Amino acid sequence: MSAPEEHKETPLEVIHEFINGVDDGTIRRDLGEDCILSFYSRNVRGAKAITGFLRNQLTMRYKHEGFEEAAQIEWGDELLLKARFGRSFDSERRRIYEEKERTGTTLHVRPESDDEEVNEKFSSTLITPPRPSSYNLNSLKYVEACGLLNKRNEHIYGGLDMGESCAVHLTLGYRSTFLPGGQVSGFEICLAVYDRGLTSLKRSTLIPPLCSISFARRASARCNPTTDDEEDTEEDSTPPTARRCVRRTLFTEENTQKEEDADFIPVVEQEQPAPQEQPAPQQAEETGEVVIPVDISTALKTTNFSSCTPRKRQQATNGNEVVRKRATGPRRMRF
């Protein structure tokens, strides 16, 4: 008996085998039972579910073109793929194992006899489901390629709508297997990741691009000036724009200065009359006037201010005014 033939697939052969199966609808033969599809961050698990999804959403509307180069992914990207899909692989393997356990038969053929009692023997071995591990992911080989998804000319309703053409970065994880005959080795796809917009190989599909495009802001864009605690130096601060919000407009230095100027009223110094000089005693004797010395402090204490400033001013009355007459008693009219 001859040994099985070993055939090492190139990355480009694996990519072409997969896209040909997707385009003609025969992708089921290339998928493993625990396969996972990530189509633009939408995950589909299981070979049957993936086959139905690709036939309904992709095969009838788009066709793979331009996949001329393929290469193995970098070690860093491989670690990212394992960290991203490791838990999904473990849960999918557990689901497959539980389905096989439920479908297994539990019937046993025993001789029917009323006289003999058959002692049931229980096995002492414990059957446990597979523990979470990344064994399947570690055994996979990963390849990547870039191409296009071009829309077919047929007018078919339904499925995905990604425009006339869409750039695709395709990453596949596969493992080597033996065909049913046992003489020829093959491979089965266990992971397929579609990413949009990437056109170069040897770069991660799971992290954002290193450089980002920055657009210059318009001159008329709304911008508020920084406050005193936000700006470092006066030289670095930019002049304020024409547009400002209400709060910034009310509490700017210009407006506060204007308010202070409006409230400021210049005080005009009133000319105080010159103090009158008291006549000397010699002049008083000549004029014959008697000068009585008055203490200012005692005069202020004895002066009654109510007499100076009455609470109600007395209005001057003319002689032609008539005093108002008001009826009292029963003669008073009631309304």
From Swiss-Prot:
Disruption phenotype: Rough eye phenotype, and/or male sterility and in, some cases, pupal death. Pfam families: Roughex. It comes from the Eukaryota. Residues 222-291, 304-335 are annotated as: Disordered. Residues 266-285 have a biased composition (Low complexity). One of its GO terms (biological process) is regulation of exit from mitosis. One of its GO terms (cellular component) is nucleus. Residues 227-237 have a biased composition (Acidic residues). Residues 304-320 have a biased composition (Polar residues). Residues 325-335 have a biased composition (Basic residues). Negative regulator of both mitosis and meiosis. Required for the establishment of the G1 phase in the developing eye. The rux phenotype is suppressed by mutations of genes involved in cell cycle progression such as CycA and string, and enhanced by mutations of intercellular signaling genes, Ras1 and Star. This is Cell cycle negative regulator roughex. It comes from Drosophila melanogaster.
